[in-house]
Each structure stands twice: as structure tokens, then as C-alpha cells.
Design a protein with these regions (language model features):
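Short amphipathic alpha-helices in soluble, non-transmembrane regions
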Residues: 33-37, 197-201, 342-346
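Phosphate/pyrophosphate- and phosphate-bearing ligand-binding catalytic cores of soluble enzymes
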Residues: 8-11, 150-328, 333-337, 353-369
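Anion-binding (especially nucleotide phosphate/pyrophosphate-binding) glycine-rich loop
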Residues: 1-147, 157
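Generic non-transmembrane alpha-helical segments
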Residues: 36-40, 99, 221, 294-299, ...
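Residue-level signal for inorganic ion chemistry
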Residues: 26, 50, 116, 148, ...
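Beta-rich strand-turn-strand
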Residues: 102, 335-342
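Short, low-complexity, polar/charged sequence segments that are solvent-exposed and flexible
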Residues: 40-43, 65-66, 84-87, 104-108, ...
Length: 369
């Protein structure tokens, strides 16, 4: 139990001190730390890999519980075959993806390179290249802080949506009601990936959308694509010191297209239902826009914040990535307020130009965007 700067455990490397910091390496330690803080009416902040978190320069005046439990356990093979795997919440997500390929657990290869821990993936329903983690999650075991009991959610009970779940929707005094302890995954077996759904990835693999490829090759191509956009952590590349995509792709009523340029890209909003999201239905009332397109066409180019008048916003300490417009990066000595300032400028500019409100993807603590 110590004081710790949150900049030391977040990928954007910003954030002031935690009044109390606890690194919990087992399920029992996690439950004890959270329960004790709750019993003392102490504010609680749950941190996994710190890749989706921005804390203000003032820090957090409460208890930070750093989830550091690790381990992967193969469970008895289910009646339907395949692989059933239980993973501790603090396990590094990308390490688990690599293991899944070695074990020929088919499915998550397209989610390679995403920073953070396994426990965070169901909260956000992490996704990339047309694949979402909800497609492979069987259940999630949690600690329910409201009633001080363990609670396990089956896939269908998690209410997965676009970067959303019941775990994200329920809060206790500003932090999650349900603390993820373990995640159970169910995979089919084989060396081939799930069908490739994303055109850019399919092209790099030399296959058509809907076809499969070797999972190991999919991982290699995804890591290369992400690295080209500064989306794989690299100590020598300042573009990777970020929270990844800062804004979600806006979901708007179909009628909103009438006020946007004809060439503004839009995509169907697909709702997944049934076990593992096997049933899909397209919304007739809403569409998904491209946040990157909106940002760029509102006048914000790669590297916004580094040169010219835009440098005055954060003194060049923070900027949009020089590789793409969706990430806000720490150029070396940024404060949290510098990140927030760039975010506010971009958000206001898009709203003024297109009338669309961008929604931040990372959790923001004690800051204003």
C-alpha cells in the first residue's frame, strides 16, 4: 500500500498521484482491497493495463487497485467441442492472443496488438478489424461491490454493444460496480482464423473479405498494420504513447446523413444477439460514422498540436498522432491537461463543422473534455 503516480501505470504516461495504491496479484487480494476501501467509504479506481485511462494531473484522492492477477487455465472440454479457457483478469491481452495462436484456439488473431489486460476486454467489448471479443466470451466472473458477492455473467447477460457492456454501464460512486476477476472464453479449434471481415486486412493477407487465413499470418499482418498507425506500444515512437483511438465512431440517426457531405462514410449498426453474438441484425434507424473522417474533414490533420497556431493549445507537448487522426499522443512531457486540451479542440471543431458530438473512448478521471 503506497502512493504512486498514475503516469507510471498508464500508456499515455499522464496522471497525478494516487493517495493509496494497491497492486493486487490474486483474486483474494483484489476482493480484499476493493471491499476494504468500500467499507471505509473510500473512492476506488480500478486499473488494469492503463491503456484506456486518463487521470488528471491532480491524481486520484482515494484507493487505486491495480489488477495484476495472471494465469490461463484450460477447462474440461465442453460438450460442443472446442476449447474452454479461463483467464485471470490481469493477464496481458496480447500475450493471451499469442498463446491462443500457439494452441490453435481460433478467433482472436485479429485482436492482436491491443494494449491492456484481459479483464478490461469485456467491459469495453474490445474490437478491431471487424472482430469483437464478445464473439468468444462464454462468461465473466466478477465481484459485485453493491451487494458484496461474487457474480458470474453468461455471454447473453453481458448486453454487449459497440464498445459497451453491462459492466461498463453500472457504476458505484464513479467506478465500476462489477470488478472483473476472470474471463472464460470458448474457441473452436484450428489454425485458421475466423472469417476476415475488414477490407484493409483482407488486402494485406491476399484474401477476399469473408475468407479465412492462417491465424499466425493474420496476427503478423495486424501487428504490422497497427504499428504503421502507431497503435503498438514502442518506447522509441512517441505516437504510441496514447490511449489508442481517443473517440468512438459516432452512432447517429439515419436522418443525420442529410446534413453531412454525400461522401461522408457511414456503416450499418449491427446488433449481435444470441450466444456469442451469432445472430446479427442491422439497425434501420441508426448508422455509424467514421470519427477519423470527421476529424480530418473538420480541419484537423495528423500532428495537429505540433506546429503553427495549433501548437499554442498544448505547447507541442501533446498532439494528434503523426500517423493518423484518432489518437492523442504524449510527445514526451505532456500533462494530462495538455491531452484534454487537444481533445476539447478536436471535439469542438467537429461539433461546429458537422453538428456531431464525438464521445471519448478512454475513461477520464477528474478531467474535463
Amino acid at each position: 500500500m503506497t502512493e504512486k503516480l498514475l503516469s507510471e501505470i498508464t500508456t499515455a504516461q499522464v496522471g497525478g498521484p494516487a493517495r493509496t495504491y494497491i497492486r493486487a496479484t490474486t483474486e483474494a487480494e483484489i476482493v480484499e482491497a476493493v471491499s476494504s476501501a468500500d467499507a471505509a467509504n473510500e473512492p476506488v479506481l480500478i486499473v488494469g493495463g492503463g491503456s484506456n485511462l486518463l487521470v488528471s494531473d491532480a491524481g486520484f484522492d482515494g484507493t487505486v487497485v491495480h489488477i495484476a492477477s495472471t494465469g490461463v487455465e484450460e477447462l474440461p472440454i465442453p460438450a460442443c467441442g472446442g476449447a474452454n479457457v479461463r483467464v485471470q483478469a490481469g493477464t496481458v491481452w496480447d500475450d493471451f492472443v499469442q498463446l491462443s495462436i500457439e494452441k490453435e484456439w481460433s478467433g482472436p488473431a485479429a485482436l492482436s496488438g491491443i494494449p491492456g489486460t484481459v479483464g478490461a476486454t469485456p467491459v469495453q467489448n474490445v474490437g478491431a478489424y471487424g472482430v469483437e471479443v464478445s464473439e468468444f466470451i462464454a462468461s465473466v466472473r466478477t465481484w459485485d461491490r453493491q451487494i458484496n458477492q461474487f457474480k458470474t455473467f453468461a455471454n447473453a447477460d453481458l448486453r454487449f454493444g459497440y464498445r459497451d457492456s453491462i459492466l461498463k454501464q453500472n457504476m458505484v460512486n464513479g467506478s465500476p460496480r462489477y470488478v472483473v476477476l476472470t474471463v472464460d472464453f470458448q474457441f473452436t479449434l484450428g489454425s485458421l482464423s475466423s472469417p476476415i471481415k475488414y477490407g484493409e486486412l483482407a488486402k494485406s493477407l491476399g484474401v477476399q473479405v469473408g475468407e479465412r487465413a492462417e491465424s499466425a499470418l493474420v496476427r503478423d499482418k495486424v501487428l504490422a498494420l497497427r504499428a504503421s498507425k502507431g497503435m503498438v506500444l514502442d518506447a522509441s515512437d512517441r505516437d504510441t504513447f496514447s490511449t489508442g483511438s481517443f473517440f468512438t465512431n459516432p452512432i447517429v440517426p439515419v436522418s443525420a446523413l442529410d446534413s453531412l457531405p454525400e461522401d461522408a462514410p457511414h456503416f450499418p449498426v449491427v446488433t449481435r444477439t444470441g450466444v456469442f453474438g451469432t445472430e446479427q441484425q442491422e439497425s434501420e434507424e441508426h448508422v455509424k460514422l467514421s470519427a477519423a473522417w470527421l476529424i480530418q474533414h473538420a480541419g484537423f490533420e495528423k500532428g495537429f498540436g505540433l506546429e503553427g497556431d495549433s501548437r499554442e493549445i498544448a505547447g507541442g507537448r501533446a498532439s494528434l498522432s503523426t500517423k493518423h487522426t484518432l489518437a492523442i499522443t504524449n510527445r514526451g512531457d505532456a500533462a494530462a491537461e495538455d491531452i484534454f486540451a487537444i481533445a476539447r479542440a478536436v471535439r469542438a471543431g467537429v461539433a461546429e463543422k458537422f453538428g456531431v458530438e464525438l464521445v471519448p473512448e478512454p475513461v477520464v478521471v477528474n478531467g474535463k473534455i
